[in-house]
Amino acid sequence: MRIAWSPRAVATAARFMKDQEGMREIGAAINALAQDPYPPESFSWGSYRRLRVGPYRVMYAVEAGLITIDRVDRVTAS
């Protein structure tokens, strides 16, 4: 499957560029989606999927051979 980043995803991920290790983990998790777009640690969120990667959440959609990364956010502790 192909992976595409929306402009919003690029903008939201850019806020966390100082966390190089976190960005490497996010990159590895997103690349793994090409092999398995529905890993057991991802959850349905309406028409999106959400994937927790350390302190981050990746929101993405899967459609017709394309995975679109919609946003990357830091998860707040509750």
PLM regions and their residue ranges:
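Short hydrophobic/aromatic-rich motifs at helix boundaries and adjacent loops
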Residues: 1-3, 29-30
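Enriched for short, Lys/Arg-rich terminal
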Residues: 2-3, 14-15, 20-23, 53-57, ...
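A short, surface-exposed loop/turn module that caps and links secondary-structure elements
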Residues: 27-52
